[in-house]
Amino acid sequence: MPVGGMRIIDRIITVMRPIFDELIVVTNIPSAYQGLDVTFTNDTFTTRCSMTGLHAGLKAIKNKKAFVVGCDAPFIKTEMIKALLRFDHPDVDVTVPSTQAGLEPLFAIYSRSCLNIIAQHLLQGRYKVSDVYSRLRVKTVDERYLRKADPDLISFFNVNTPDLISKAETISLRMDTQA
């Protein structure tokens, strides 16, 4: 899906490529993303949701941890990712932003050690990502620190409704004008 003339997945990869040595896209239709220099994996559970995507992505990583972002976030910022990485610690399973709107589980750092607990939740039909947090070591990062990297927290904006897609186009035009 394009925003500002560029597919969201391409926007995300452009930001993440200089930061990470391993990029994984969870999709059941890899042909839709031909030409991308990424590793593809697919869901191992039949239910399609963020939690199954998280599980598949963590299962595919070679590293101990992964930065995870939803593929509907067109405005992620390098500075925001780096800010979150600075707060991550080897002794935590999840490093997640916390804002007035709540937690941002689809813009977070996850350890491979989360896999079993995520799988248990999926097998129980529990699909909300943040529900696993009570069974994990979680580090929350307050928005006052994150706003230093992304004052408007635009990195958390996602486009999962037609109205939000329209709003994203407006934001993209504004950002292009300011650049």
Feature names for model-found ranges:
Residues F156-V159:
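Conserved anion/nucleotide-ligand pocket segment
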Residues L164-I165:
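Catalytic donor/gating beta->alpha subdomain of glycosyltransferases that bind UDP-sugars
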Residues M1-R126, D131-L153, E169-D176:
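Nucleotide and nucleotide-moiety/phosphate-recognizing core
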